[in-house]
A protein has these predicted regions:
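Bacterial N-terminal signal peptides
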Residues: 1-8
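Terminal presequence/propeptide segments associated with secretion/organelle targeting
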Residues: 10-709
């Protein structure tokens, strides 16, 4: 496998940075891993043709990672990754979000509609095939357009060859669009909920502790993959059986010490490690700032309603969690980028690059002027993108009515929608509105309109506010009240009844929610069209800047940015010092749960039966062998980002001893610049997971089916 390391041969591997492609691991990588304590033969770590550790790692759903921990398709992932699934099964009478869920038999496991688990099947370098088909593109937009079509053709050809609806094929770019791989996955669509801890365990600490260390969150949930009788992926059927995986990971209860080897394998979503300083400024001011302001307002309104009503809390729990996660991430990122001086680091890199280009003559001619072109483009797009972001966050991602009404002004779409069988149409609408509360959205809409009026140029949003100013004296609340009183869109029964009318398209074309939605999407489309040509020098610059820096620094490790494909990171168990006279240890224990427990708090109120177990202190076989305590979480120097949630943390022998679930506040700049002295991966200790399953859930059948050492 080492011979395939095309781009990274000769690089001096570093343990403190890198989301490495397993098929590109070099001799230097392996030597560094072994120096840190790794013991397995490298072929036992990654080999798609025979059982290996990496075979146990899966894409869970659409944006998380999981790990197979039994010969019967048992999957461990994070609680926040399984949150949507748990919420989908929760009702006021059966509140699994709050109370947890335990299945004591296969038949009690709950099928989750729409949830998939994907296993990596193959990966093939198609860079030469793609570049050979390029037809002298005039600019970067045309180049990317040609590449997209070539990739689609390659995907279609491979899908046709595989002839399976349960195979997913995709071509993904790497190294800033300088390399391409064609990847296939086996996709299992019969996935069932097996176990979930109470919400006060799985989300212990809530927003307050999110992205923070020390941590005491039991962030895990358990699912099972089912297959047909031939052990192949299949849609849900009562006749399906637990999947027998190629490899399942061994679970280790041995524990750990400072500086022990730790390795993550997962599917990190996105990083931007090689962007210049002006791109960082754009991220902070034109993307993060609008997200922080708008979501903060929206979430305050949501939270008040959720605290007042249990049904609303259940409906909005998942939406709130998704929104608040990257709201707080954006706050932390901006603070860390400033505190750690990332802009100055980037400017120093740019100055060094410009000096190298100037000194290299014709050799570096292709890179001349690319930074100044990119800087000019960012200056032009900044204010436009900022306003576009406010509009998107507030009226497309903030209030829900605008997205709900999208397309209902198109008569052809309405006629097609209305032509469906009544039962099918009713089910579809019911599914769409399952977690929607019109009265709450009615409160959100005026707040979102107000922020758009404050932050977006008046002439750009005049189509929205001319009516509000003329008919309602500029009063956004009065406008929102009238819209919800006169529209059928917020109410599923009214919408269904309207769609069954022969003149449904005509009625909906005049609906106030549809009229608002049409205006919002027209304005947003105008923004997008204005921004599109400005991205051309940026896309071109990013590709060439990466290629140029690699030429400038041939011995420097430059692992490809994350792109939701399988990566590994290796490091060690280690604490850190976030400030003068402050030292954080590398693990937490159950004592911290008792210290944080607060019956008056919605975030720190421990579930009563679980609290009794913690107070009792009978850890059994799950106690640490050295100190006798129940370890809850630990931190490591691994390099992860969003998408790594649920990633198994493997020890030196390739055994799972934790599940990665978060990063630390002081290093929220990590997606842009890795800071080895501060950046840590926060991991739930597998022994805490097993303690919860065993002692609280009394679910010995799950313990028995795992390989635990």
């Amino acid at each position: 496998m080492l011979a395939t390391a095309a781009l990274s041969i000769g690089y001096q591997a570093k343990a403190d940075k890198g989301m490495w492609l397993l098929n590109e691991l070099t001799r230097e990588n392996v030597a560094q891993m072994k120096e840190l304590g790794f013991r397995l033969p490298i072929d036992s770590l990654y080999n798609l043709d025979k059982p290996s550790v990496a075979n146990s790692v899966v894409i869970f759903g659409r944006g998380c990672t999981g790990v197979t921990v039994s010969s019967q398709g048992l999957i461990f992932t994070n609680h926040h990754c399984g949150f949507d699934a748990i919420q989908s099964q929760s009702t006021v009478d059966h509140d699994y979000l709050r109370d947890g869920f335990v299945s004591q038999s296969f038949s009690a496991e709950l099928p989750i509609e729409g949830l998939t688990v994907s296993y990596l099947s193959s990966i093939r370098d198609v860079t030469k095939e793609i570049l050979a088909q390029l037809k002298k593109p005039k600019n970067e937009i045309e180049r990317l357009s040609q590449i997209q079509k070539i990739c689609q053709s390659l995907e279609a050809a491979e899908s046709k060859r595989l002839k399976s609806e349960h195979k997913r094929v995709q071509v993904r770019p790497y190294y800033a669009n300088n390399k391409y791989y064609l990847i296939t996955y086996d996709v299992f669509s019969d996935v069932r909920l097996v176990f979930a801890p109470p919400g006060s365990v799985g989300k212990f600490g809530g927003d307050t502790d999110n992205w923070m260390w020390p941590r005491h969150t039991g962030d895990f949930s358990v699912f099972r993959v089912y297959a047909n009788k031939d052990n192949a992926p299949a849609n849900y059927s009562k006749d399906n059986v637990p999947y027998k995986p190629k490899y399942h990971a061994t679970v280790s209860t041995e524990g750990y010490e400072k500086n022990d080897y730790a390795m993550t394998i997962g599917f990190p979503g996105s990083t931007s490690r090689y962007i210049p300083s002006f791109a960082v400024e754009n991220r902070m001011k034109d993307q993060n700032d609008p997200r922080i302001e708008v979501r903060g307002i929206k979430q305050d309104i949501w939270r008040a309603a959720m605290n007042a009503d249990q049904a609303t809390r259940i409906k909005y729990a998942s939406k709130y969690a998704r929104s608040s996660n990257y709201w707080k991430n954006s706050i932390g990122m901006n603070k860390a980028l400033v505190k750690l001086g990332v802009l100055d680091q980037k400017r120093a890199e740019e100055a060094s690059f410009e000096e190298w280009v100037a000194a290299s003559g014709k050799k570096a001619q292709a890179y001349k002027g690319i930074l100044s072109e990119m800087e000019g483009a960012y200056k032009k797009l900044g204010n436009i993108e900022r306003q576009s972001m406010y509009l998107r966050e507030a009226l497309i991602g903030g209030t829900e009515i605008v997205s709900a009404a999208r397309g209902l002004g198109d008569s052809a779409k309405v006629k097609k929608l209305a032509s469906q069988p009544k039962e099918q149409l009713a089910q579809m609408i019911n599914d769409l509105y399952k977690d929607y509360v019109p009265a709450l959205d009615q409160k959100v809409l005026p707040a979102m309109l107000d922020i758009v009026r404050q932050r977006v140029d008046a002439n750009r949003v005049a189509p929205i506010f001319d009516l509000i100013n003329k008919e309602y004296g500029g009063d956004t609340k009065a406008y929102a009240d009238a819209l919800f009183a006169n529209s059928v869109v917020p109410y599923k029964d009214k919408l269904l009844a309207t769609l069954q009318q022969p003149n449904a398209a005509e009625i909906l074309s005049k609906d106030p929610a549809v009229l608002l939605s049409n205006k919002v999407w027209e304005i947003y489309t105008a923004f997008s069209n204005e921004l599109k040509p400005l991205y051309e020098p940026i896309d071109r610059g990013n590709r060439l800047y990466f290629a140029g820096r690699r030429e400038q620094n041939p011995s420097k490790p430059m692992p490809s940015d994350a792109n939701s494909t399988m990566r590994m990171s290796y490091g060690t168990i280690k604490g850190y010092s976030p400030a003068d006279a402050v030292e954080y240890d590398y693990f937490t224990t159950s004592r911290g749960i008792l210290e944080k427990n607060d019956p008056e708090s919605t975030e720190f109120n421990v579930f009563p039966s679980f609290l009794e177990l913690i107070k009792k202190g009978d850890w059994g076989r799950w106690a640490d062998k050295k100190d006798g305590k129940l370890h809850v979480a630990f931190i490591s120097t691994n390099d992860i980002t969003g998408g790594n949630s649920g990633s198994p943390v493997f020890d030196k022998n390739g055994r799972v001893f934790g599940l990665a679930f978060d990063g630390n506040w002081e290093a929220m700049s990590g997606d842009i610049e890795f800071e080895p002295n501060l950046q840590r991966t926060i991991v739930v200790d597998i022994r805490y997971v097993l303690f919860t399953i065993d002692k609280w859930g009394k679910c010995s059948r799950l313990i028995d089916e795992m390989t635990i050492k």
